[in-house]
């Protein structure tokens, strides 16, 4: 069918009638609140109690170069417009006084004359122009307005930092002759424009009532979030592909690198001591405020851990505590590790622990049978050296010389390609008996 034929096709009378009925029902709720004379015009501020709570501690709004949205969001309800007339809604911000403000000793005080403002920015609601019935059918939200401290256009409102403003709504009737119908403002919506929140009470209120905000994290937490991938829920998979080398962080989770196909559906059981290192979400803001966000990372449970960190020589070294943060010496010891060259399976017997270290002849994959390695007593693994000085009772291991090592964890499988495994003494995992069960602070590759 030719394009001209498509362009000239007309909808049937039934289709047109249906569309008109949809429009009519949409505007009917607004018509019921209308007044063709506009004498009963009324504007109500939505969420007035929330605005009042912010005003009691002097509200602050962030202004940035690229623009920042307001919270609380300015939202109003209008009644008494002519349902069949066309109106546009505009928003601007007027200074409330002739001062510049500063925050001193926990309060806002005047600090000199204000900056001269040579610009006047007006925000036009994106639904403008529209019928009065449209404006009256539901609350009107100015959620898309952005506040900036740079004059860059794009519908943003430019404000001077450390000046106090009050939003002002204008209703203009459009048609053959435009005319101002009304303008209104609400004192509880006043705020001081800032580039960073000054009052911690305001910060806490913003976090409490705006759980989607990202601007309220402390600098320490923001730096921490730059070093780790974006927060995910427990039901999602996580992939760390750009961290360079293997990193076993202090918390219960494991961060893997070098292979974007490695995914963990659940954290491996490597609990952490009481330390701020590792993949975790800081639950408090500046030490005492609660954040409304779910925990972004696996939390600590204050128990011992084993840290594996890749050295420059691509050897995997074990750090067990603050007193032993140096490389382990490589000394031959014949009685430590038995490595028979065999392709047959090894049946070491049952183990009560949820995490098993398995060695297979392949290149490391999530499936496939292979000989297993079980630790009968607490221990850790060292990659790269053929033997390490350690008591012979630490680990009983049988494996081929070149193998792929798999970690069987519930509910996921993870693979690590290695050449040789040896054993050294270390602190036990959580829940294992034996000496050295106390937690120690270990270095982490995720230190901020």
Swiss-Prot record:
GO molecular function terms attached to this record: DNA-binding transcription activator activity, RNA polymerase II-specific; DNA-binding transcription factor activity, RNA polymerase II-specific; RNA polymerase II cis-regulatory region sequence-specific DNA binding; sequence-specific double-stranded DNA binding
PROSITE patterns on file: TBOX_1, TBOX_2, TBOX_3
One GO term (biological process): heart morphogenesis
Xref: InterPro entries: p53-like_TF_DNA-bd_sf, T-box_DNA-bd, T-box_sf, TF_Brachyury, TF_T-box, TF_T-box_CS
Keyword flag DNA-binding: yes
Pfam family of the protein (one): T-box
Superkingdom of source: Eukaryota
Subcellular location: Nucleus
Keywords: Activator, Disease variant, DNA-binding, Nucleus, Repressor, Transcription, Transcription regulation
Residue ranges: DNA binding: 45-218
Annotated Gene3D superfamilies: Transcription factor, T-box (2.60.40.820)
Cellular component annotations (GO), alphabetically ordered: chromatin; nucleus
Keyword Transcription regulation included in the entry's annotation: yes
Main location: nucleus
Function according to Swiss-Prot or TrEMBL: Transcriptional regulator involved in developmental processes. Can activate POMC gene expression and repress the alpha glycoprotein subunit and thyroid-stimulating hormone beta promoters.
Disease listed for this protein: ACTH deficiency, isolated: An autosomal recessive disorder that is characterized by adrenal insufficiency symptoms, such as weight loss, lack of appetite (anorexia), weakness, nausea, vomiting and low blood pressure (hypotension). The pituitary hormone ACTH is decreased or absent, and other cortisol and other steroid hormone levels in the blood are abnormally low.
Name under which the protein is recorded: T-box transcription factor TBX19
Organism: Homo sapiens (Human)
């Amino acid at each position: 069918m030719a394009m001209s034929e498509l362009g000239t096709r007309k909808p049937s009378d039934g289709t047109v009638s249906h569309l008109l009925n949809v429009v009519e029902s949409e505007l009917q709720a607004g018509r019921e609140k209308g007044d063709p004379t506009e004498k009963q015009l009324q504007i109500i501020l939505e969420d007035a109690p929330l605005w009042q709570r912010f005003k009691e501690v002097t509200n602050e709004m962030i202004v940035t170069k690229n623009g920042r949205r307001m919270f609380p969001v300015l939202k109003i309800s209008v009644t008494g417009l002519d349902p069949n007339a066309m109106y546009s809604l505009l928003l601007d911000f007027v200074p409330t006084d002739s001062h510049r403000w500063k925050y001193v000793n926990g309060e806002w005080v005047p600090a000199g004359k204000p900056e001269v403002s040579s610009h006047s920015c007006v925000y036009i609601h994106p639904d403008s122009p529209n019928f009065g019935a449209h404006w009256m059918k539901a609350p009107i939200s100015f959620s898309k307005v952005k506040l900036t401290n740079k004059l860059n256009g794009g519908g943003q409102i430019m404000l001077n930092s450390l000046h106090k403003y009050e939003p002002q709504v204008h209703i203009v009737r459009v048609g053959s002759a435009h005319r101002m119908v009304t303008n209104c403002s609400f004192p509880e919506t006043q705020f001081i424009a800032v580039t960073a929140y000054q009052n911690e009470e305001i910060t806490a209120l913003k976090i409490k009532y705006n759980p989607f905000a990202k601007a309220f994290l402390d600098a320490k937490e923001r730096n921490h979030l730059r070093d780790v991938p974006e927060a995910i829920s427990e039901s999602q998979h996580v992939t760390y592909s750009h961290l360079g080398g293997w990193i076993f962080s202090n918390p219960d989770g494991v961060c893997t690198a070098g292979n974007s196909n490695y995914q963990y559906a659940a954290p491996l059981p490597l609990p952490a001591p009481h330390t701020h290192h590792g993949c975790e979400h800081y639950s408090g803001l500046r030490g005492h405020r609660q954040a409304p966000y779910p925990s972004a990372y696996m939390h600590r449970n204050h128990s011992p851990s084993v840290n594996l960190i890749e050295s420059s020589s691509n050897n995997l070294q074990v750090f067990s505590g603050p007193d032993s943060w140096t490389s382990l010496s490589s000394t031959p010891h014949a009685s430590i590790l038995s490595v028979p060259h065999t392709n047959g399976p090894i049946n070491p017997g049952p183990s009560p622990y949820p995490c098993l270290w398995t060695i297979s002849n392949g290149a490391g994959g999530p499936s496939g049978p292979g000989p297993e390695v079980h630790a009968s007593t607490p221990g850790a693994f060292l990659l790269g050296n053929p033997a390490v000085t350690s008591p012979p009772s630490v680990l009983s291991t049988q494996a081929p010389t070149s193998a792929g090592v798999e970690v069987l964890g519930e509910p996921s499988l993870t693979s690590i390609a290695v050449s040789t495994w040896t054993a050294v003494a270390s602190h036990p995992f959580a829940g294992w008996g034996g000496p050295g069960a106390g937690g120690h602070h270990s270095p982490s590759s995720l230190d901020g």
